[in-house]
Swiss-Prot record:
Its EC number is 6.1.1.20. It catalyses: tRNA(Phe) + L-phenylalanine + ATP = L-phenylalanyl-tRNA(Phe) + AMP + diphosphate + H(+). This is Phenylalanine--tRNA ligase alpha subunit. CDD domains: PheRS_alpha_core (cd00496). It comes from Pyrobaculum arsenaticum (strain DSM 13514 / JCM 11321 / PZ6). The gene is pheS. One of its GO terms (molecular function) is phenylalanine-tRNA ligase activity. Binds 2 magnesium ions per tetramer. Pfam families: tRNA-synt_2d. Its main location: cytoplasm. One of its GO terms (biological process) is phenylalanyl-tRNA aminoacylation.
Length: 488
């Protein structure tokens, strides 16, 4: 008994007499093209007869597919008729009236006085003929030749040549059986000889692998680098600091009392750390502790100030820079991750990025601060920005900064203010004033790129990454730093 590939065996079973290969493929739930290799194999082995016949057939054009879905102009025109008292009226204001009338002329349809008016019996006969023509668009094989010729003139269908393949079994189906297809054999198959009854599936190494879209840079990393470029273009110098910070730089140096609610465990990640910790200079510990005890009127704890935490704000980095540089005229910024015990939702995350900056110099005012904030916002492409009065422990006066999101409306993305003397003086800054701000870059990216869920900034979906990168490229090409030198 001859052993055949299962697909070839199924063709032979179904083709005891001449059958169209398309019909056999449909019964097997396969495409006719995928069966061709088995048809050729059957012919080569002499178990299958094959005949090919070239025929002319009609197929829908793109316009034909549209008309099949939306309706022929004359069909839509007639369906808009209003019938009353045995008369049917169609207004010539119909958008397809011109084309419809050209195709209805053979029925004797003529406009008069801005309308087409027909007795209802005539209207029904014409509509029935047009409906039949409309149905043929979904079943071209049953359409009369004159209808097909009309469709061809209207470029609704086109005539093409197709090769029809007919197959017929050359041997009784009982004389063959299907093989068991294997992609691998075991040592037991070889030892028992079962491998002789298997059909090993060949691997065609010449087949090209499927194309996969080229990877794109991560849009959010590109955005962060761009913000860095903008800040440097505005004359700022970048500074950096540790993610694992002591409470002193994260809170105490910013005149945030040690019993402030923001320092509770529900707002700060406290770290159990047995490694070395870089303590702040002794003179700063003493100066900051003295200001806390004098102004907040409580016993300041040096031990608490040295507790390790994951930084909750990148102001910890800029306050370090201020302590190191002291008085003078300079502008610094930092970009980095911060951490807070937030519940993850479309607007909040327990880990996000901040842009922090300070401008140091004598005679700086609140007006300078708002001007600097507006300058940065416009450099990043945010055209609609609002400021609202706010309170922060370490700045006065203070504002919250909002920008308009296309879906979420006005979204707060940062705070700003002028450092209080209780912050600057313990650090040795007495002649200068310090403008300071901290902005949430995740929310800014959402605003600029039209993203309404903060979790999408870290998506791993390749399709979404390509979509958001395309938005980034569009934004980047239309907005941003022009290389100009900006001054306060």
């Amino acid at each position: 008994m001859l052993v055949l590939h299962p697909a070839l065996y199924e063709i032979i079973v179904r083709a005891r007499d001449w059958r169209l290969l398309d019909e056999v493929a449909k019964e097997l739930g396969m495409q006719a093209e995928s069966l061709m290799r088995y048809v050729e194999e059957g012919r080569a082995k002499g178990v299958l007869q094959v005949e090919k016949k070239v025929v002319e057939v009609y197929e829908l054009t793109e316009e034909g597919r549209r008309r099949a879905a939306e309706g022929l102009p004359e069909y839509n025109f007639l369906k808009s008729a209003t019938c009353d008292g045995g008369r049917c009226v169609v207004s010539l204001s119909h958008p397809e009236a011109g084309v419809a009338l050209a195709n209805l002329a053979k029925f004797g349809v003529r406009p008069r006085g801005g309308v087409v008016e027909l007795d209802e019996e005539t209207y029904r006969k014409i509509l029935s003929a047009v409906e039949e023509k409309q149905r043929y668009l979904s079943a071209l094989e049953g359409a009369p030749r004159d209808v097909l010729q009309e469709f061809a003139r209207r470029r609704i269908v086109r005539r093409v040549e197709r090769t029809l393949i007919y197959v017929k079994a050359a041997v009784p189906p009982e004389s063959v059986r299907p093989a068991e297809v294997k992609t691998a054999i075991t040592s037991a198959d070889i030892a028992t000889g079962r491998w002789r009854t298997y059909l090993l599936k060949p691997f065609d190494l010449g087949v090209e692998p499927p194309e996969y879209p080229a990877p794109v840079p991560h849009f959010f990393n590109e955005f962060l680098d761009y913000v860095r470029e903008v800040m440097i273009g505005l004359g700022f110098e970048e500074v950096r600091g540790p993610v694992l910070e002591v409470e002193f730089w994260n809170f105490d140096a910013l005149f945030q009392a040690q019993d402030h609610p923001a320092r509770e465990v529900h707002d700060t990640f406290y770290i159990r750390w047995e490694g070395p910790i870089e303590a702040p200079p002794e003179h700063l510990l003493e100066a900051v502790g003295r200001v806390h005890e004098e102004k907040w009127r409580y016993k300041w704890s040096r031990e608490k100030a040295l507790n390790p935490v994951l930084r909750t704000q990148t102001t910890a980095v800029t306050i370090r820079a201020l302590a190191e540089r002291g008085d003078g005229e300079y502008k610094v910024f930092t970009i980095g991750r911060v951490f807070r015990p937030e519940k993850l939702d479309p607007k909040h995350s327990m880990e996000f990025h901040q842009l922090d900056g300070i401008v140091v110099g004598p005679g700086l005012t609140f007006k300078h601060l708002l001007g600097q904030l507006e300058q940065i916002a416009k450099a990043l492409g945010m055209t609609r920005v609002r400021f609202r009065p706010a309170y922060f422990p370490f700045t006065s006066p203070s504002v919250e900064v909002y920008a308009e999101h296309p879906k979420l409306g006005w979204v707060e993305f940062g705070g700003a203010g002028i450092f209080r003397p209780e912050v600057t003086e313990p650090l040795g800054v007495r002649k200068s004033r310090v403008l300071a701000w901290g902005w949430g870059l995740d929310r800014i990216a959402m605003i600029l790129l039209g993203i309404d869920d903060i979790r999408e900034l870290f998506t791993k979906d390749p399709e979404k990454l390509r979509e958001y990168y395309a938005r980034w490229v569009k934004y980047r090409s239309a907005t941003g730093s022009t290389g100009k030198s900006y001054t306060l």
